[in-house]
């Protein structure tokens, strides 16, 4: 299993700080947030960790220069999450951990890998339950038990099929790269991972795993400070 950490975002919600320090390198306790995510990938059993970065994030490469299991690829254009993942295409099952999504309170990736093994190596998407009034902010799962039937992007409260939302972690088969390569660009010319996964669902089962930890979006100041508080409390 190879881990992919998309970390090419420009961090505009954290300006002017991110002109100097990439958001993924902001400290959580005494360590950069990205290092905690790399450790999560290792704990899940990833043999190699590919970090997708953009120009200007060389500080990230410098920090991990002595980590033999970490390598870097560049996303030269900001064309969506699917496009970022595609830059790191490998012939292996992939664990995708969003670089601005920190999970506090559990090792979500490890638990997802164990869940996948219990289900015959099935694809697994890490999820969280969200309040009904917030479903319009997330990709929401349509489920049959734990099996994913469909994914609905940012539905209204009335249209939401559940309160189970995508939460920054994916464990997918290598064939996802074939779907990404043939995925037509969507809004803004972006290639979205969710669209490719939906196509894959037509031929392959995938499951939602609601992990017990708390996801924090460290890509914005409020989420970052919430992550700091949660990390200290944990």
Language-model features: where?
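Conserved donor-nucleotide/metal-binding helix-loop-beta segment in metal-dependent transferases, i.e.
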Residues: 105-135
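Short beta-strand segments
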Residues: 6-7, 96-99, 126-129, 210
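A structural signal for short hydrophobic beta-strand segments in well-ordered beta-sheet cores
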Residues: 25, 141-143, 208
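Ligand/cofactor pocket segment of small-molecule handling proteins
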Residues: 130-133, 137-146, 154
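Catalytic-core segments of class I nucleotidyltransferases/pyrophosphorylases
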Residues: 95, 117, 147-234
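A conserved hydrophobic position in a structured secondary element of the catalytic/binding core
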Residues: 55, 104, 143, 171-172, ...
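Conserved N-terminal catalytic core of the sugar/cofactor nucleotidyltransferase
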Residues: 1-5, 13, 26-27, 31-97, ...
């Amino acid at each position: 299993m190879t881990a992919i950490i998309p970390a090419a975002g420009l961090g505009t919600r954290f300006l002017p700080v991110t002109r100097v320090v990439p958001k993924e390198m902001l400290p959580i306790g005494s360590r950069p947030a990205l290092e905690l995510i790399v450790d999560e990938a290792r704990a899940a059993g990833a043999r190699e960790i590919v970090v997708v970065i953009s120009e200007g994030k060389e500080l990230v490469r410098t920090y991990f220069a002595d980590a033999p299991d970490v390598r870097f690829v560049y996303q030269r254009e900001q064309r969506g999450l699917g496009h970022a993942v595609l830059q790191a295409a490998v012939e292996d099952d992939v664990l995708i951990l969003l670089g601005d999504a920190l999970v506090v309170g559990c090792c979500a990736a490890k638990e997802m890998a164990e869940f996948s093994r219990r289900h015959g190596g099935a694809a697994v998407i890490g999820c969280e339950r969200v309040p009904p009034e917030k479903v319009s902010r997330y990709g929401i799962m349509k489920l049959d038990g734990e099996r994913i039937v469909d994914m609905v992007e940012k539905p209204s409260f009335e249209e939401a099929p559940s309160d189970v939302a995508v939460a920054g972690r994916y464990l997918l088969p290598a064939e996802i790269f074939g779907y990404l390569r043939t995925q037509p660009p969507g809004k803004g010319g972006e290639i979205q991972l969710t669209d490719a996964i939906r196509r894959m669902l037509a031929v392959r089962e995938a499951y939602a795993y609601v992990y017990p930890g708390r996801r924090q979006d460290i890509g914005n100041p409020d989420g970052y400070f919430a992550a700091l508080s949660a990390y200290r409390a944990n």
